[in-house]
Amino acid sequence: MAKVIAVGIKKLYYADPAKVTGDLTGTLLGTIIKDPATKQVENIHQDTWSIEEEEPSTTEYRNQLTNGVYRQDTEMGNIQMSFTIGQYDYETKAAFMGGTGSETSWKRARGVTRIEKCMIAMTEDNQYCVFPKASVIARNTNNDGAVGIGVAAAALEPDNTAVSSEYWFDSSEVDVE
């Protein structure tokens, strides 16, 4: 059995969540990655990439007679990919921040923009982490004197009940050739 370290980031893709049509497999993931509509992030600014899962929150209920805990509720923490795109075009800015992007300009949308993407990360040790449906919040951020696009992509529960909120695959399971 292969050991997983899941260190760093080698590749990062984003796609329409509707492309995940059922329980995600390595074969379906390969098809999504090869789809011309799937885009690759070409630049992630140094030391900004991470995947974090918040600690679950728990509520304990005590028996008033004994003061012992007799029941506990748990709420799982959010899972989030975070990164800053250091170099980008205006179409990429629009894909993550909303608004309208062209080859030579970007215009911010009025009001709140809700953006959802299928996020696909490949680590340096060739492990794929996939959020089939993620809520994307992005903003302008200053990194080392340049304005990047700071992105937080939080895994959501997909609409299709056959699809999980997070998947991991060894690259040997994913055909991208």
Predicted features, each with a name:
Residues A2-Y88, P132-A146:
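Solvent-exposed edge beta-strands and adjacent loop segments
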Residues T21-V41, G99-K107, T161-F169:
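Short secondary-structure boundary segments
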Residues E54-P56, G86-Y90, E124-N126, L156-D159:
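Generic structural motif
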Residues E75-N78, W106-G111, D144-V147, A154-P158:
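Glycine-rich loops and low-complexity Gly/Arg-rich segments
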Residues Q80-T84, C118-I120, G150-A154:
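Beta-strand secondary-structure signal
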Residues I85-R108:
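Charged, amphipathic alpha-helical segments
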Residues E103-T141:
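Acidic, glycine-rich flexible loop segments
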Residues D125-E177:
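Mixed-charge, glycine-accented linear interaction segment located at domain edges/termini
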